[in-house]
A protein has these predicted regions:
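Acidic, serine/threonine-rich low-complexity disordered tracts
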Residues: 17-110, 168-277
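Solvent-exposed helix/loop surface patches that form functional interfaces
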Residues: 113-213
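Hydrophobic helical h-region of N-terminal Sec-dependent signal peptides
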Residues: 4-10
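C-terminal segment of classical bacterial N-terminal signal peptides
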Residues: 12-15
Length: 277
């Protein structure tokens, strides 16, 4: 399914939040600054529906994002996991590996929307995580294996694994003024791949938020058996005072060789308020 998910990401990038010379909507009224801190909660539920391999995983994370430095072209941010819980019907041993990230500071470079680019000091992060693995009770052979697996990951995959929620937030945090309305990427087929996507933008009545939604569908008819299909729906509320999302929900449904439903919800806690006019 890797190739199909790459097509999903391509479809998302193809339907960019549109610009317009007139009637544009603000997306960020105050610039990012060093010292900014925001608290988020992330809730994920994944159900694998393949016969004979059914499973369910539920996790909840609470984390803080601090701006360490801000420039027009990008940010330096710090991610700190504050609390975590996880249940997995097929692998109950995953929760300690997640909980070991609690308290580990992860500084990273990001683009202007907050999308992670690279970790600033992976060796320090690795060593802090190793100490936490010992603190949560993993024996030495298990620690060696977990750290070895992390060490051999490509840098981009490691960033995605640790900071996946940040990428979801950044997907819905445009840094250019946008135009209200509905915008479609027409259905198109290239070889075995067929895809379509839709984006809509509308202002909130209070003047402090924007509602953004993205829907896309990608089908791969190549190979034997049924076609692989991915459908993804994302809805979010952007707090235009600071340009960061107050809530994002993404539902991804796959069918074909892999059958699953994943729902991810990330929201700020406490929710940002609208300044009195």
């Amino acid at each position: 399914m890797i190739g199909l998910m790459a097509a999903v990401l391509l479809s998302l990038s193809a339907v960019q939040t549109p610009e317009g010379p007139a009637g544009v909507l603000d997306v960020q009224r105050t610039t990012d600054a060093a010292g900014d801190r925001r608290l988020f909660v992330s809730e994920t539920e994944l159900a694998v529906l393949d016969p004979g391999a059914e499973g369910r995983q539920i996790n909840r994370l609470r984390f803080e994002i601090e701006t360490l430095a801000a420039a027009p072209g990008g940010l330096t941010l710090r991610y700190r996991l504050l609390d975590a819980s996880l249940t997995d019907s097929r692998n109950p041993g995953l929760e300690p590996l997640l909980k070991a990230w609690v308290g580990v500071d992860v500084a990273f470079s990001a683009d202007a929307s907050g999308r992670p680019i690279d970790l600033m000091d992976w060796p320090s992060v690795r060593d802090a995580y190793a100490a936490r693995l010992q603190a949560v009770g993993l024996d030495e052979p298990a620690r060696v294996k977990v750290l070895g697996d992390l060490e051999t990951l490509p840098a981009g995959a490691r960033v995605s694994m640790i900071l996946g929620d940040m990428a979801l937030l950044a997907d819905m945090q445009p840094r250019r003024p946008v135009t209200a309305g509905r915008f479609d990427q027409p259905f198109e087929r290239q070889g075995d791949l067929a895809r379509s996507a839709t984006l809509s933008v509308s202002p909130a009545p209070d003047g402090c938020g924007l509602s953004l939604t993205r829907s896309l569908s990608v089908e791969n008819a190549g190979g034997a058996g049924p076609a692989d299909i991915v459908r993804q729906d994302i809805s979010s509320t952007l707090h235009v005072i600071d340009g960061w999302s107050s809530e994002v929900t993404r539902k991804t449904t796959t069918s074909g060789r892999v059958n699953s439903v994943e729902t991810v919800r990330v929201f700020r806690d406490p929710r940002p308020t609208c300044p009195a006019s």
